[in-house]
Amino acid sequence: MLKRTEKHIARKNNLSIFYIQTEDLPGQIGTIGCIFGKHNITIRNIEFINEKKDEEVLIKFAVKMPSDMSKEKIMDELQRVNGVKKVTGQ
């Protein structure tokens, strides 16, 4: 969960937050980044939150999205990436 200050900063900077639980695969960050890039979404921050197992990792992405972009559409596309277990957003 974001701390109160982080939530304020995200809102002030018009950032969206995505949490992605994924298998720890070579190139996985690049694959996710390509999806964001394809939709003109700029990654502002990446944070590795938790490694539950050696094979999985929870990654928090803070991104700047175009105003007409549907967050649900991006979440659906990210969910289809090989190795991604769960995608949530704030």
Regions found by a protein language model. Give the residues of each.
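A short, glycine/Asx- and small/polar-enriched loop/turn
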Residues: K52-I59
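Conserved short beta-strand edge segments in small beta-sheet-based binding/regulatory domains
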Residues: R44-E47, R80-Q90
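Helix N-cap motif at beta-to-alpha junctions
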Residues: L25, K64-M69
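Long, continuous compositionally biased terminal/linker segments
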Residues: V63-K64, I74
